[in-house]
From Swiss-Prot:
Its cofactor is [4Fe-4S] cluster. It comes from Helicobacter pylori (strain ATCC 700392 / 26695). This is Phosphogluconate dehydratase. NCBIfam families: edd. Its EC number is 4.2.1.12.
Amino acid sequence: MPKHSLEQIKEKITERSKKTRELYLENIFNPKNQPKIESLGCANIAHVTASMPEHLKMPLGSHKRKHFAIITAYNDMLSAHQPFKNYPDLIKKELQEHNAYASVASGVPAMCDGITQGYDGMELSLFSRDVIALSTAVGLSHNVFDGAFFLGVCDKIVPGLLIGALSFGNLASVFVPSGPMVSGIENYKKAKARQDFAMGKINREELLKVEMQSYHDVGTCTFYGTANSNQMMMEFMGLHVANSSFINPNNPLRKVLVEESAKRLASGKVLPLAKLIDEKSILNALIGLMATGGSTNHTLHLIAIARSCGVILNWDDFDAVSNLIPLLAKVYPNGSADVNAFEACGGLVFVIKELLKEGLLFEDTHTIMDTETQKGMQNYTKTPFLENNQLVYKDAINHSLNTDILRPVSDPFAANGGLKILKGNLGRAVIKISAIKDEHRKVKARAIVFKTQSEFLERFKNKELERDFVAVLPFQGPKSNGMPELHKLTTNLGALQDMGYKVALVTDGRMSGASGKVPSAIHLSPEGALNGAIIKIKDGDLIELDAPNNALNVLEKDFEKRGINPLFLETLENLEKPSFGLGRELFTSLRLNVNTAEEGGMSFGIKV
């Protein structure tokens, strides 16, 4: 039955995507779009090889050696991206052992949401995904490469790289992660310290010490947010070397896994990206998201990725998959364990084995791990080890080593996935239920409407919010201000929830992948900037958020006939004016062209 249901979901997606998918494949494999180094003029070729070692110039210029692109998101600001500094040299060295070479074709920007969280720079965050996609395309537009490596990990970077890569889907491509930082202070202790600071129980210096014990090394943050959800999705899509997501950066195995990615691409056996990414692989990523309680941000990113290769995915598909796939993992914020503990007790390889065993994952996909004798997701059911400095894969364990963190399909944490779609007279919204305790999944309370995130924080500081209420924060969607994450509200709402108050959040903005403790109806669509119903809400309106029943409604008789709350008239009138400061004015055209959250929040102006 589950297998049959998954097949039905896939068939619906295939049918609605028939024309757009055919057009994508036709364009990607059009002969005029294929790499052309042999047909370039001699001056053009000389520019390609000018900076290369002398002994490689003629072989590469005459295409006697394969030449691969490296698109890197390396910088020192992101702990997860700092390890990428040395990856190009590792890749180049390994490729030369296989009569091939690589060039860093482009660097792409990579911003840290952890740094900009709660500040104006966060308004660039979602749009940075599209800038990364554009930057990726610029790097590959030289059109002289036989394939490409993509070095990225964090929130907007992997989706942006993949969106850009899919415009060059004729190239064989491998995504290379850096892995999570080693564990520091437990994530729940960090969250408690933030709440204690918000309540005035500890001072700034005490909080800073705790934060630095949490974020203390190279690698991704150890909670299961968007960055680590990205890595999960790349595994489920078959774009990583198998089970390479959660190996720490300084583990000797990490270097060998990077070298293995180079071997894979040099072998010539990796299919073009457009043949790897299709309805099945996209659904596999969605299945993995639900089974592991992944980030809400992928209700945007996965849709954008799918549309970039002609596949029309929507929130109804998320709902259908969530109803079918059980929750198998409890990693912070869904539980107290971090991704290192998750990896130690079985990790993604156990999740994949379980889903395949129960017919809850498409096995017959193409991956970068395909061999002549074995293709598909079975290649991701083995664990990598280092023996005599050689990479070997062995059968993974068949049971979880800690059922408080990881469980089999036969005994899941929940029968359904970690995300739900809410519907009602406010529109449609996303909620992450896997981190919400049962007693908080339904809230009926009066609305308090806020114009800005800072207004909420100020009123909390003044102890004006110590009651049951639903916080309503409109004009945080893509067209309003770039859809910033509102994770800074989580600490304060969580503190109020711990005090015994019934609280919830309704917004057209986003939350961090680390959010989840407080019931939050996010990505509300239509957004306020498109005259969505959220801008009709007034202080005192009774709102019901009922996650178990997928419902979100304002329980006022006059609501649907009501006009805009006068509080927001000025905001609505000023939407087309640019926001200045921190470069936000440069992103005005992206904001004005962006599509809806349900369509992926893409700003390219492409209609799919």
